[in-house]
């Protein structure tokens, strides 16, 4: 049976995985997802940040059980399809769906007029079945991409990781920074990020830095380096613990966040900063070796 699972699926979190699992019980799963995020078209001022790139979303959806992933370009024309046009042109015309699986918060069609209830009522008339998956909860709150973004932005990385069922990560090229870390014996990989990236709260984290086939335990710093003079934007940088002589510039890097260690602090000079950095690295080394 041709089963179609619909959603944005940013992050491919525990709730999304349940939708794919439900669909997989019914037949071969095609996931239909959207890019750019529909909100960026219908209400650009409310565009959310991204938990993962579209490329990684496709990869994670396949890991979750999808056989095919179709990324639909969500543009102005698409946003103006009525709910019935969406059913006729997209679900049936383009995808030949025999069964559709959605989360209970999935709305569709112009101004999101098509509800899950409406789809389950008209589906049989069009000749396809409909399954509506209840939203998953954790500690009494719904698991959603919005909630996970908030947790990450607040620095609650362990909680976010639980809901994602994996470690949150950022990817980007290693760019040239101020070389400050190199000068003080802690050379860091400075990540170039997409403007859509969801960046954790300023502070120091323990995690992992990967480039190519290599992966190292890392102490990760996010912030503006307030100990040093000058005005700079927020930076995400990772120090590969116990590694010497790495040259990572211009290579694609991945920084995985495992644990939050502390807030960003402003130190009175270099000595107390170096003392704290040694403690951070010791703690990160221990946490990442478990």
In which residue ranges do the predicted regions lie?
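N-terminal Rossmann-like or analogous alpha/beta NTP/dinucleotide-binding catalytic cores
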Residues: 40-126
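Phosphate/ribose-recognition catalytic cores of enzymes acting on nucleotide-derived substrates
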Residues: 177-290
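Residue-level signal for inorganic ion chemistry
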Residues: 13, 61, 100, 160, ...
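Glycine-rich, Lys/Arg-enriched anion-binding loops that position phosphate/diphosphate groups
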Residues: 123-224
């Amino acid at each position: 049976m041709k089963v179609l699972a619909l959603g944005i699926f940013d992050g491919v979190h525990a709730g999304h995985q349940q939708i794919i699992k439900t669909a997989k019980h019914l037949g071969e799963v095609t996931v239909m997802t959207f890019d750019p995020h529909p909100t960026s078209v219908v209400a650009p001022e409310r565009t959310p940040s991204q938990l993962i790139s579209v490329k990684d979303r496709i990869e994670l959806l396949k890991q979750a059980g999808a056989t095919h992933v179709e990324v639909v370009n969500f543009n102005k024309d698409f946003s103006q399809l009525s709910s019935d046009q969406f059913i006729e042109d997209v679900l049936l015309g383009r995808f030949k769906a025999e069964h559709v699986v959605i989360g209970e918060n999935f709305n569709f069609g112009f101004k999101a007029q098509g509800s899950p209830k409406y789809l389950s009522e008209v589906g049989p008339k069009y000749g396809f079945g409909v399954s509506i998956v209840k939203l998953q909860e954790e500690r009494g709150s719904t698991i959603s991409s919005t909630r996970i973004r908030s947790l990450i932005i607040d620095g609650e990385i362990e909680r976010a990781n639980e809901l994602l069922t994996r470690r949150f990560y950022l990817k980007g090229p290693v760019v040239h920074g101020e070389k400050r870390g190199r000068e003080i014996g802690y050379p860091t990989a400075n990540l170039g990020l997409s403007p859509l990236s969801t960046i954790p709260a300023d502070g120091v984290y323990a995690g992992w830095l990967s480039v190519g086939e290599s992966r190292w335990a890392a102490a990760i710093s996010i912030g503006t380096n307030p100990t040093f003079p000058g005005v700079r934007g927020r930076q995400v940088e990772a120090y590969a613990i116990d590694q010497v002589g790495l040259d990572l510039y211009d290579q694609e890097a991945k920084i995985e966040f495992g644990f939050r260690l502390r807030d960003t602090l402003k130190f009175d000079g270099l000595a107390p900063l170096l003392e704290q950095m040694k403690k951070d690295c010791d703690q990160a080394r221990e946490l990442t070796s478990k």
